[in-house]
């Protein structure tokens, strides 16, 4: 299946490279000059310097032409741009199915991205999500990686096609029919990675990181239960797997943001240092809205939110969390 990958950042480029190891794949991006440079260099020097493209990767700065060449579309963009991209794609899609590899919620509304896609495209369009523990650089360098491809039950055949299109000796995509659970895990882990990053930036030690990841996972599970997600989804690649990677790997933007905050930088200073979108900042607002709506206790998430919004310092947040009343670990 020939894909058009829409979004030429690090993750979009890496997924386009992975797909093109099997079949011709088109990579589209908004920045015409940037796309021309990619075509000339046969690499994405801005985000993945020095990693050469496979021969079957086609660079195209024309959205209409990119989609016309394809049999399916894969959207890879920040969550805040997801709806806008789908509006552009809608009149061009025809009978093509659509997948996405974006994580987070629609800013302001807190809607899951599959809800945004259903509203714009209609639920008759086959759709699937690619998610899980996968740094772009490792995928681009063809290092062994496992992800999940999630879809609604009625679209499971398309999810299987996506999985097969991505499959190589070093890349495997497991199938899931718990789309909401897969989306939730991929979003909440960004908030928890901020927490572990803050703790590591404060040099609180390995015990603290382990505690935050474990108790943070409990928060994810409680919210998932309230939303009707399958617990095994959150304990799998799209939940626990992604949490482990994002909370411990220094390629994670959310972890690096947390590290910067823990070392005393402001949000604006940290954003400038990282230079790319940090999904966890906006996602914190949306996870808090969900927690309040469903009356789910999420103290780590709440304290990250307070730090991000300047209501607490990192030291105050730590003291507040450690001072919480003693209670059973489970229940």
Predicted segments — roles?
Residues 100, 126-131, 173-177, 236, ...:
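General beta-strand structural signal in soluble alpha/beta enzymes
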Residues 196-200, 225-235, 239, 243-331:
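NAD(P)-dependent Rossmann-like dehydrogenase/reductase catalytic/cofactor-binding core
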Residues 1-51, 58-61, 88:
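NAD(P)+-binding Rossmann beta1-loop-alpha1 motif at the extreme N-terminus of oxidoreductases
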Residues 53, 59-144, 162:
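Rossmann-like NAD(P)(H) cofactor-binding subdomain of soluble oxidoreductases
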Residues 81, 92, 116-126, 144-194, ...:
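Internal alpha-helical scaffold of NAD(P)-dependent oxidoreductase catalytic cores
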């Amino acid at each position: 299946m020939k894909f058009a990958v829409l979004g030429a950042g690090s993750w979009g480029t890496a997924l386009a490279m992975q797909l093109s190891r099997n079949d011709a794949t088109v990579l589209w991006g908004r920045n015409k000059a940037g796309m021309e440079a990619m075509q000339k260099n046969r690499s994405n020097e801005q985000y993945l310097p020095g990693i050469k493209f496979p021969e079957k990767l086609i660079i195209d700065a024309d959205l209409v032409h990119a989609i016309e060449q394809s049999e399916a579309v894969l959207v890879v963009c920040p969550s805040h741009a997801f709806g806008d991209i789908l509006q552009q794609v809608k009149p061009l899609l025809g009978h093509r199915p659509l997948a996405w590899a974006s994580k987070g919620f629609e800013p302001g509304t807190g809607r899951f991205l599959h809800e945004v896609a259903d509203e714009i495209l209609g639920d008759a369009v086959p759709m699937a999500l690619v998610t899980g523990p996968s740094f772009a650089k490792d995928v681009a360098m063809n290092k062994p990686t496992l992800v999940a491809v999630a879809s609604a039950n009625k679209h499971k055949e398309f999810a299987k096609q996506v999985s097969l299109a991505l499959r190589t000796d070093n890349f495997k995509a497991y199938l899931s029919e718990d789309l909401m659970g897969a989306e939730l895990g991929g979003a909440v882990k960004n908030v928890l990675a901020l927490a572990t990053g803050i703790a590591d930036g404060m040099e609180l030690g390995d015990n603290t990181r382990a505690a935050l990841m474990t108790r943070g996972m409990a928060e994810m599970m409680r919210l998932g239960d309230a939303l009707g997600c399958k617990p095994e989804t959150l304990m799998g690649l799209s939940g626990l797997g992604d949490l482990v990677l994002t909370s411990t790997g220094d390629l994670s933007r959310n972890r690096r943001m947390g590290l910067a905050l823990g070392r005393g930088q402001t949000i604006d200073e940290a954003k400038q240092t990282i230079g790319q979108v940090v999904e966890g900042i906006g996602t914190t607002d949306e996870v808090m809205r969900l927690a309040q709506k469903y009356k789910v206790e999420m103290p780590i998430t709440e304290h990250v939110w307070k730090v991000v919004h300047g209501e607490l310092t990192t030291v105050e947040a730590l003291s507040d969390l450690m001072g919480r009343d003693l209670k059973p670990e489970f229940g």
